């Protein structure tokens, strides 16, 4: 019974293995080792051996069953002996000979004698399948039993020296928290890795002898040479082996844990938290600890779960993600380096001194590293809400990601990177132009605001009054200032004159008061016995009283009579006042004298002259013509004369959203296909995709004579094909990039090629295929808002010549380009009946600018109708081939010492990288450099090493070599609203529309290109998570280090040549072969001019020092950014996305220079174009239908459907214009037909403000003599919606513009003045009712101005009752005067009684003003 029970157990084990991770028998079974082995299932045989091996590793129970031993021995002879397996297991983990491999029972054999087993069912974490196939079942083993499956690598494949002698831990118990979180963890034996925040947590266990128990956790346990997953509750089992009678275990390991979603509670890690106890020796502490449980709470699921959602959890959304973390490894003789070190000895003490196994210790080194993460396939969705959300005082974009990731926003040269946790609000970047959003995984969105920037001051206020000023002049603010100055300018001038005058007067009086305050008073006169008031009075007494002369009246008196006369002299008061007045004048500086004198004499003249000057300046500025940059160089035959300039991109940029030729009219079966496909893309439901395919097959079959090409809604979901958290042999592989913005633009125009024609909202192609492609346009703003976030549109129409002339996107008043039509000269003009047949050619050059173009007028003086041919450039980009050179950054380097008491130093001082610098000093032991236990003198060795501790602090930089490949241009040619062809011009293209043939050359004369070497830079400030894809800036690389040629400390002295080096020490995602790949260990570091040395400290090992080493070179990169050219300011990059593949980085580099992008040569060849001549008389020209809908002051504008009837001829080309000045309509051609039931014409209009009625008239109505005005003019009532604050997905817009330019200076000024007068007349007519009333009302302020001019001084005398500046207090200041001049004046003063002569009348007036006795300003002027 026992035997049968044992066989039942084996059969159960076999049944379990059939469902486990295993290889097929034919693929993995080795050759039998006995001549006649029993017939045993190879899978069962493998499980028997594996269980015995796991038992030898201490990871499973030993199946000590005699019958099992008998079966195993019958298969492998004595190979199943437990002791033999333990010996072979030790060799498996110890022997580092790379030529040694191992068979099924771990017998060591040369690799040449063993063939790796092919495995198609299992790939261990961290290893690429191609690498697995090379070593599977020879150096890579999968040991599995009923309880666990363990993957191990032999030391011949991986030798990280992680096994250490096992010691029983002696811990002194202490108190501590029973439960704690990882972020509050402070234990010597446990380290939480600060990595990218997610559902997984990484914990490094530094002392494996301390038991760890898991509960409700999903854990991956990485022991460097082995790893296994643990899902059940229980202790962590550490791999071990027996060698020389001692047990060896992994010293440190890494746990990557997350909450088991099927469990009831959080994940709990129960262990002993060890802390430093009492100090036994200097720097050596005993172990002290307490039982604790680390609690990890999982993220609670909110909302419902879709059936189609994947069970796999994912932690990141981009394959180029790098999260900062850490790693821990046991230090051996060949794997030391910089970083924090901690040493455990004999299971009882802990220290930071590096000690090895010879001391019964092992040292663990903590390393700064980055971890890579790969998203699940098809789960990296990125969407942007069309409607803006309030965030504080601003509006923000709402971005949705499937998981947390980095989102880059850019607008012009303003680039920002934001960390987004599934849903986040991002402020709209400052600047002008479209908003580009780069999502994780490479998805791109181009957005623009729906609210159109009508740069007319206060256009939506004052009842639209300001729009008239914007119509009068290209500079509406100047025009507004002109009219304000005309009405109130003179009053403003007068008020300004008063203010200036009284300011000068107040300053003068303040100066006089301050000087008087500190002026020395006069002395007592001994002759006349009178107190002198001032120093000037003192001088007068000295000069007069000495000669017995009265100082005031000048009479000579006896000495006694002088004393009686002077106090009662009748002229004393008058003379003192005169002296005081003169002194006031002298105390004021000369500049103030001049200013006051000028204000008194020329005040009125200055006021009037100022008013006239300002008026003339404002008037000339208001009517001055604007000057743009001409960007065309027409090349025409000598017998042709044309005027050719380009169209203004500002206007085109305006209508990149306003204008489009087609709007949705019918939502038929094809629309059903688009809607179903759109729904399927949003849900990723195979059922929905199949349903949409069925609809397409049933509705678009062979019955349709033409296939329809439909523009697809582009909702791009980032799809990565790698497994989550898996490091490959070429581990850093992000997968392929999705299509970018430029590829989407190309698809839009290539889907509607020149073999197709536009019919309503579709581009129809005549090959009968069932595949369709639809042009998605607006059908009302509400329907647009629901689709904007996930669709791109090709909008096609002519632009609108706005009568107010003030729509702004980049520059309103000074357009970047001048614009005009080319009047094509004809080689032949033939008249046949009522038709004119034209033939001719024209050649011109269009400089490459975004959203610009050129228009030809196809008409003749003898023709009554005219067609307009538009060749427009939607966009263009320069395509570059980029080659990766190296990765660098502002690295931090650190040193470490190693020493031995006897023997040699470790090879390369224990450094295992190619970037370290080391130096050794043999036989360096002496009493000053020895620890207390080392008595050696002249023995041993000392070495120092220095290496990279942290590769990036503030900057992550990549250097590239670029090569210009080509320039792709998106060109569209349009003749009417139903004849429009688009294509991507690479090697020249030809467009044929009826009798018109347009040939566009290759891009030529490209002047601005990217430098041959560039740097992509990412700033890591405040965010230690790196997404290599998101380069924040691109700069030139003139001052960056060349490849492996650099001085130490310069930008680029560290050069990472293999991308796997970035994750070399990451061990939280399975096995990592990156640190073994010889190509990985190829980082280059410049140590030019650097040297190492050491210094001794008695009683301890020596310490290292260095000279010439820059420990951190952040300042070098700061200086680099200040000196290099910022290419983001000179280029608009459609794509600068970076991906990782094949151990290097790749960059999809496409950009458009802001200027100097080149030019296109355009040949227009017209053969037999038929137009109606002026001999024809139109009959029955009238509107049949007209309808408009949309919003006002928004970029989507109004969509109008119109049908024009005519009785004779059968067809005629007409144009529409708006009667209302607040409505502008496109200038495109419309075909008037006699027959009914034809396609309706569609056009775009724009309303600057809300209106209730729209009126259009036919421009060619003058050719219809019998037509009534009500037939050729149509008015309809409309209900316009206000603009919604939404973002529109980027649109390729075909644009058109007609605006004649002047050819001479006089003509420019004349036309500008005429436009000004016309604008004034429009204001009078539309705002005041009539031009006559406007003139009358305008004359009133003019008359008031003339009244002020002629009688201003008289009018101001009415205000003479107002007085000011009287009774000012006087101060005293001492002033030195010329004595001789003063004596002469005083002598004359004694006789005449005046210090101011007749020629000093202005001085007396100023003195009176300063004393407060003069006239006021109004009386003076």
From Swiss-Prot:
Gene3D superfamilies tied to this protein: 1.10.8.1320
Residues of the propeptide: 722-776
Ranges of the Lumenal topological domain: 21-479, 632-643, 730-1330
Region Disordered: start-end pairs: 22-42
Key words of the record: Clathrin-mediated endocytosis of virus by host, Cleavage on pair of basic residues, Disulfide bond, Fusion of virus membrane with host endosomal membrane, Fusion of virus membrane with host membrane, Glycoprotein, Host endoplasmic reticulum, Host Golgi apparatus, Host membrane, Host-virus interaction, Membrane, Signal, Transmembrane, Transmembrane helix, Viral attachment to host cell, Viral envelope protein, Viral penetration into host cytoplasm, Virion, Virus endocytosis by host, Virus entry into host cell
Endpoints of the signal sequence: 1-20
Glycan-linked positions: 97, 346, 639, 1081, 1299
Single Gene Ontology BP annotation: virion attachment to host cell
Involved in fusion with the host membrane (site feature) positions: 804, 927, 933, 935, 1101, 1215
Annotated S-S bridges: 901-1096, 929-934
Residues that span the membrane, as ranges: 480-500, 611-631, 644-664, 709-729, 1331-1351
Family statement: Belongs to the nairovirus envelope glycoprotein family.
Protein name as it appears in the record: Envelopment polyprotein
Native source species: Hazara virus (isolate JC280)
């Amino acid at each position: 019974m026992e035997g049968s029970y044992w066989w039942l157990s084996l059969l159960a084990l076999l049944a379990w293995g059939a469902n486990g991770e295993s290889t097929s028998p034919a693929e993995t079974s080795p050759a039998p080792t006995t001549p006649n082995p029993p017939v045993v299932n190879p899978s069962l045989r493998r499980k028997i051996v594996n269980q015995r091996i796991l038992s030898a590793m201490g990871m499973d129970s030993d199946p000590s069953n005699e019958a099992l031993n008998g079966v195993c021995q019958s298969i492998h002879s004595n190979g199943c002996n437990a002791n033999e397996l333990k010996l072979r297991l030790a060799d498996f983990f110890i022997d580092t000979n790379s030529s040694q491999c191992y068979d099924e029972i771990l017998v060591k054999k040369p690799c040449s004698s063993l063939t790796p087993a092919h495995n198609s069912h299992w790939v261990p974490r961290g290893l690429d399948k191609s690498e697995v196939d090379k070593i599977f079942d020879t150096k890579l083993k999968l040991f599995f039993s009923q309880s666990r499956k363990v993957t191990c690598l032999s030391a011949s494949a991986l030798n990280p020296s992680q096994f250490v002698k096992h010691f029983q831990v002696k811990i002194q118990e202490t108190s501590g928290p029973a439960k704690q979180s990882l972020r509050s963890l402070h234990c010597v034996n446990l380290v939480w890795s600060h990595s990218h925040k997610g559902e997984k947590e990484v914990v490094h266990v530094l002392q494996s002898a301390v038991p760890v128990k898991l509960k409700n956790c999903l854990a991956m346990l990485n022991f460097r040479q082995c790893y296994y997953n643990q899902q059940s509750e229980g202790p962590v089992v550490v791999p071990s082996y027996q060698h020389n009678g001692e047990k060896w275990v992994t010293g440190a390991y890494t746990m990557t844990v997350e909450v088991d979603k099927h469990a009831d509670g959080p994940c709990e890690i129960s262990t002993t938290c060890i802390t430093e106890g009492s100090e036994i020796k200097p720097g050596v502490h005993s172990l002290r600890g307490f039982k604790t449980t680390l609690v990890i709470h999982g993220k609670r699921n909110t909302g419902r779960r879709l059936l189609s959602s994947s069970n796999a959890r994912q932690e990141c959304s981009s394959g180029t993600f790098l999260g900062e973390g850490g790693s821990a490894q046991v230090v051996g003789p060949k794997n030391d380096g910089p970083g924090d070190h901690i040493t455990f000895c004999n299971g009882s003490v802990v220290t930071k001194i590096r000690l090895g196994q010879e001391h019964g210790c092992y040292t663990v080194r903590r390393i700064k590293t980055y971890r890579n993460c790969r998203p699940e396939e098809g789960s990296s969705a990125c969407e942007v809400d069309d409607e803006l959300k309030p965030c504080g005082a601003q509006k923000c974009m709402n971005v949705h990601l499937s998981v947390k990731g980095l989102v880059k926003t850019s607008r012009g040269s303003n680039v920002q990177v934001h960390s987004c946790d599934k849903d986040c609000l991002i402020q709209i970047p400052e600047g002008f132009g479209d908003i580009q959003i780069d999502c994780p995984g490479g998805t791109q969105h181009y957005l623009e605001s729906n609210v159109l920037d009508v740069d007319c001051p206060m256009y939506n206020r004052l009842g639209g009054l300001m729009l008239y000023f914007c119509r009068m002049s290209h500079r509406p603010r100047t025009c507004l200032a002109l009219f304000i100055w005309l009405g109130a300018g003179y009053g403003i001038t007068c008020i300004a004159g008063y203010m200036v005058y009284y300011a000068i007067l107040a300053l003068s009086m303040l100066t006089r008061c301050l000087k008087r305050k500190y002026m020395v008073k006069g002395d007592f006169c001994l002759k006349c016995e009178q107190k002198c008031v001032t120093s000037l009075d003192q001088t007068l007494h000295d000069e007069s009283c000495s000669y017995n002369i009265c100082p005031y009246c000048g009479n000579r008196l006896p000495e006694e009579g002088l004393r009686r006369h002077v106090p009662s002299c009748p002229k004393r008061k008058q003379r003192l006042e005169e002296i005081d007045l003169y002194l006031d004048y002298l105390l004021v500086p000369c500049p103030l004298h001049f200013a006051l004198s000028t204000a008194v004499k020329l005040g009125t003249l200055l006021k009037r002259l100022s008013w006239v000057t300002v008026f003339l300046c404002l008037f000339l500025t208001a009517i001055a013509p604007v000057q743009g940059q001409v960007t065309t160089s027409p090349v025409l035959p000598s017998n042709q004369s044309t005027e050719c300039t380009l169209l203004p991109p500002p206007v085109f940029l305006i209508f990149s959203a306003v204008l489009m030729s087609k709007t949705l009219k019918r939502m038929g079966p094809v629309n059903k296909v688009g809607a179903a496909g759109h729904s399927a893309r949003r849900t990723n439901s195979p059922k929905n995709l199949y349903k949409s395919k069925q609809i397409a097959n049933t509705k678009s079959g062979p019955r349709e004579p033409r296939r329809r090409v439909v523009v697809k809604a582009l909702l791009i979901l980032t799809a990565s094909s790698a497994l989550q958290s898996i490091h490959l042999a070429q581990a850093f592989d992000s997968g392929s990039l999705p299509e970018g913005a430029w590829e989407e633009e190309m698809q839009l125009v290539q889907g509607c090629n020149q073999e197709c024609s536009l019919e309503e909202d579709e581009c129809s192609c005549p090959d009968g295929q069932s595949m369709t492609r639809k042009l998605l346009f607006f059908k009302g703003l509400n329907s647009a808002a629901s689709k904007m976030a996930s669709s791109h549109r090709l909008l096609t129409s002519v632009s609108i010549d706005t009568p107010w002339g003030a729509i702004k996107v980049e520059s309103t008043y000074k357009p970047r380009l001048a614009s005009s039509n080319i009047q094509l000269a004809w080689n032949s003009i033939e008249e046949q009946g009522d038709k004119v047949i034209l033939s001719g050619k024209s050649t011109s050059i269009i400089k490459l600018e975004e959203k610009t173009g050129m228009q030809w007028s196809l008409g003749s003086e003898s023709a009554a109708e005219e067609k307009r041919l538009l060749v427009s450039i939607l966009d263009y980009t320069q395509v570059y081939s980029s080659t990766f050179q190296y990765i660098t950054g502002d690295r931090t380097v650190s040193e470490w010492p190693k020493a031995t008491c006897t023997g040699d130093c470790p090879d390369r001082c224990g450094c295992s990288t190619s970037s370290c610098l080391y130096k050794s000093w043999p036989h360096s032991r002496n009493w000053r450099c020895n620890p207390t236990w080392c008595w050696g003198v002249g023995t041993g060795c000392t070495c120092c090493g220095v290496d990279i501790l942290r590769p990036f602090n503030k900057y992550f930089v990549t250097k590239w070599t670029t090569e210009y490949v080509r320039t792709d241009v998106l060109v569209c040619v349009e003749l009417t609203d139903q004849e429009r062809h688009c294509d991507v011009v690479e090697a020249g293209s030809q467009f044929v529309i009826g009798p018109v043939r347009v040939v566009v050359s290759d891009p030529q004369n490209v002047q601005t290109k990217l430098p041959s070497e560039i740097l992509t830079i990412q700033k890591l400030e405040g965010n230690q998570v790196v997404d290599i894809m998101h380069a924040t800036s691109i700069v030139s690389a003139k001052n960056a280090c060349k490849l492996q040629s650099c001085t130490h400390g310069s930008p680029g002295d560290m050069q990472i040549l293999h991308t796997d080096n970035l994750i070399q020490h990451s061990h939280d995602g399975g096995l990592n072969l990156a640190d073994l790949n010889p190509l990985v260990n190829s980082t280059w570091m410049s140590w030019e001019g650097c040297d190492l040395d050491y210094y001794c400290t008695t009683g301890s090992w020596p310490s290292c020092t260095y000279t010439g080493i820059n420990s951190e070179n952040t300042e070098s990169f700061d200086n680099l950014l200040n000196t290099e050219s910022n290419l983001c300011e000179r280029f608009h990059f459609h794509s600068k996305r970076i991906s990782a593949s094949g151990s290097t980085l790749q960059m999809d580099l496409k950009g458009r220079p802001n200027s100097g992008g080149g030019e296109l040569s355009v040949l227009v060849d017209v053969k037999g174009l038929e137009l109606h001549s002026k001999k024809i008389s139109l009959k029955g020209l009238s509107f049949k239908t007209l309808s408009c809908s949309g919003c006002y002051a928004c970029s989507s504008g109004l969509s109008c459907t119109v049908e024009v009837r005519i009785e004779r001829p059968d067809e005629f080309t007409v144009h529409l214009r708006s009667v209302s000045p607040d409505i502008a309509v496109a200038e495109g051609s419309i075909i008037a037909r006699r027959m009914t039931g034809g396609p309706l014409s569609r056009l775009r209009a724009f309303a600057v403000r809300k209106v209730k009625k729209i009126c259009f008239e036919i421009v060619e109505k003058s050719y219809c003599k019998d037509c009534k005005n009500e037939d050729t003019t149509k008015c309809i009532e409309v209900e316009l919606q206000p603009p919604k604050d939404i973002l529109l997905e980027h649109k390729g817009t075909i644009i058109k513009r007609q605006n004649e330019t002047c050819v001479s200076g006089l003509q420019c000024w004349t036309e500008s003045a005429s436009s000004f007068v016309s604008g004034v007349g429009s204001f009078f007519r539309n705002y005041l009712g009539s031009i006559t009333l406007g003139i009358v009302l305008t004359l009133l302020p003019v008359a008031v101005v003339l009244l002020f001019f002629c009688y201003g001084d008289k009018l101001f005398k009415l205000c003479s009752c107002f007085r000011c500046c009287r009774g000012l207090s006087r101060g005293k200041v001492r002033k030195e005067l010329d004595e001789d001049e003063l004596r002469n004046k005083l002598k004359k003063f004694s006789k005449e009684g005046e210090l101011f002569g007749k020629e000093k009348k202005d001085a007396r007036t100023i003195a009176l003003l300063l004393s407060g006795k003069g006239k006021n300003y109004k009386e003076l002027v």
